[in-house]
Amino acid sequence: MTTADGIVRGRRVGDMLAWRGIPFAAPPVGPLRLRAPQPTEPWTGIRDAGDFGAAAPQHPRGVTLRPGKRQPMSEDCLTLNVLTPAAPSAAPRPVMVFVHGGAFVMGTTALGIYHGNRLARRGDVVYVSVNYRLGPLGFLDFTEFSTPERTFDSNLGLRDQVAALRWVQRNIAAFGGDPDNVTLFGESAGATSVTTLMATPAARGLFARAIAESSAPVLVNDGHRARRWAREFMPLLGCDDPAEAARALDAAAPVELGRAGNRLGARVLAETPGLHPFGPVVDGEFLPEDPLTSFRAGRAHPVPMIIGTNAREGTLFPRMLDALPTDAARIDTMFGLTDPEAQARVVGAYAGYPDPAAAIDLGGDITFWKPSVEIAEAHSMHAPTYNYRFDYAPRLMHWAGLGATHAFEMFAVFGYGDSAAGRALTAPGGRRGLRAVTDRVQENWISFARGGVPAPWWPRYDVDHRRTLIFDVPTRVERDPGRDRRIAWTGYAGYRDEGSAAESLP
């Protein structure tokens, strides 16, 4: 296959054609570390594109793909993957570009659930998945440490995603895709990227519609907070002199940056539960304003959007990366500037609070559900918007106290219930239900990607009716699910409000 940068050779995977590890930007190493992505150098000859590219540097133990198999890590990580049905198509295929999650500190497109075969096959679409920089190398803002000799840029991981979308515009037609029919979709940090890119001027025109699965806009940091965290990071790296910061950032090995980042993340979670030092930054340039502000003002890109969350987002986090305020002590700290009466209204909406289950649901709601509803409210006034809640969970997940937890909808989106992991989850019961929900989810995602509207039985969202699709057995439409909680959150003022009451749409 011939791209703008050279010829790539992929491989056949059953009835699909796959090209993996294609560079979409120059390796961000040496003088390009902590700089905006630069164009890749064209190559001569044929470049092998049979294997996934390296994962971005992240946890020192690496990325486990399956028992005994780890994905290599490297700063040279700016690659993407293209998957398309092998059968010829009379017309260009719709394109679905996926941004993986992982709290902006972990993840890789090499994970099996992200391969996309089942989704691309059923939808007859071109599927693209994107690696981007993570952690300190991708989502801390070191710009104030720039010197005349050494410049640092902001929002590096977000800029990587824009560079990948530009690559798609230049090259996807060669793979049979339609550059004018691109759906950008992501989960968790990937969904946060999607909603942030909708407020990013550089991303305008690079995608025609968007799907945000469990977006967490709280991960977007204002410039003041981002600069403070960058300053706190440097002593953790062993550099106490700001004048030496540029040299220290250049000299540090990725593992040293990662360890300092882990320590910073733990400190921030302890001091300000619910916030996270790694994420997009409102820098006034690449990201001019907070995405929620853009949506409320009608300045977000007016593309059709599907947005939603899972019924019990918070239950996963105490068992792994416990980055949410999921216990009463951290929730009290999180409320920060909130009036005590407003706080009482919120906690009163969670039956049993401060019991752990209620606290976990509250933490999940403030991180994912509440801001996603606010985005749906605002965007519905300017563009077609479809809101969902994913409620289905097999028996084993209910037994484990997880329910429809964070990220589980991806088993339906990617048809992963037929994988070994999916079969294990549904062994005690629920395989038929997961297949039914998978059919409904994929039907809607594919219809939306192909023509900009989901299935006809999914009504548009608006603030008058708040009709929301509930993915469950059976799948159904409900009006204003979670109404009592939504109203209770009115008046919440957290850290990012800096002393003013939070805006709330009716």
Label every model-predicted segment.
Residues 169-172, 201, 214, 237, ...:
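Sec/Tat-exported extracytoplasmic proteins
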Residues 96, 162-165, 169, 195-198, ...:
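Non-transmembrane alpha-helical segments in soluble domains
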Residues 1-155, 274, 422-456, 473-475, ...:
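Non-catalytic accessory segments of hydrolases
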Residues 180-182, 240-248, 387-389, 455-460:
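Surface-exposed patches in mature extracellular/periplasmic domains of secreted proteins
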